[in-house]
Amino acid sequence: DGLIQTDVTIVAVTVDETGVITDCVIDAVQAKANFDSQGQLLTDLTVPVPSKNELGADYGMGSISGIGKEWNEQAQALADYVVGKTADEVLGIAVDEATKPAEADLASSVTISIGGFQNAIAEAVDRAQPLGAQAGDELRLVTSNSMAAGNAPEGAAGMVETNVNIAAVTMNGDAFTSCVIDAVQAQVSFDGQG
């Protein structure tokens, strides 16, 4: 039997006119599908694929984390930590060989690997552009995720496709002040051998 796993890192930021982060939201999608040695899918792909923030305590990291924090709590702690920093300062956050925080104040609230998030945050800062958001607007990140696939018929490859639709919005009360929409479509081929 085999496993197909797709991991998608999602970051949104707002920055001021000097490139300093004023707000940050971090999320991730981890989509998994199992298949057997005949290349038949074993996973029900009609089941929704929640993001790690949507999973919250159901992700199950809190019970095994050395600090007792769930993934979404650690992602929020990292997001809070980078507010007030530039892209270069985010990239300069000290990490160990596993890219886990090496700075004591961050390591007390974050034990997950952050290297990929550092890069994603810095890229988000570099790509930020004025779209209507104002100081004090609330930044939100929303995803709609799904999987689709086809079995691997004898001698041929099957395919699993993960679709992650993303909207990063800023809001002033009930009014949208800016919106960026993007998507990730990851395709993985497989057969009875893997």
Identify the function of each model-found stretch.
Residues D1-G194:
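Active-site- and interface-proximal helix/loop "cap" or "latch" segments in soluble metabolic
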